[in-house]
Amino acid sequence: MAIPVVRLVKSLRYALKDMQGIKFSDYELIESINQAASLLYGRLSERYVYAAQKKTILTVPSVGYTVLPSDFVRIHQLVGDDGEAIPTTRLPVVDGTYRIINDTIYAKPDVYNLEYYYVPTRVKGMGDNLDVPVSMEAYIQQISLALFGNNPTLAEQIVQQCSQTLAVREVSHFTDVGPTQVLGGKI
């Protein structure tokens, strides 16, 4: 599920014609990888693309709040014993609701299934792994190169292409939508 940073750096060095590491430091290349992953996953979460989702068990203790995961960007769904909780703007929260303030979620004490959109944790060195599926590797490389070349417009175009590709991929998994129904009149 994760991509070794060393592999990404080697690919970037090849594309930049710097296999000996004379022009660019590992740090510069790793930073472009981090920026690419952050940009891509931030945009995927804005567009509600499933590929940027994670699931975890979240326990809200008796105090009524807990800290969200460190890679949390946006909530998709929070389901407890009583069913799905809905967002509220009020504190204190009531049964069946939750409120997020900064990195803290307020909810009725319970054990919840949390589905959320995330941004991969920053990588620091060549021995790390970037927490993204291998299918995203080419996009991360292309976005990194665009950012490294100081071309944010191209980076955004690649992100858009990736978002559209992944969104279509998700829809293509629907098996049978059932018979077509016409509502409100005759054909």
Residue ranges and their predicted role:
Residues 1-187:
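Glycine-enriched, solvent-exposed interface loops adjoining structured elements
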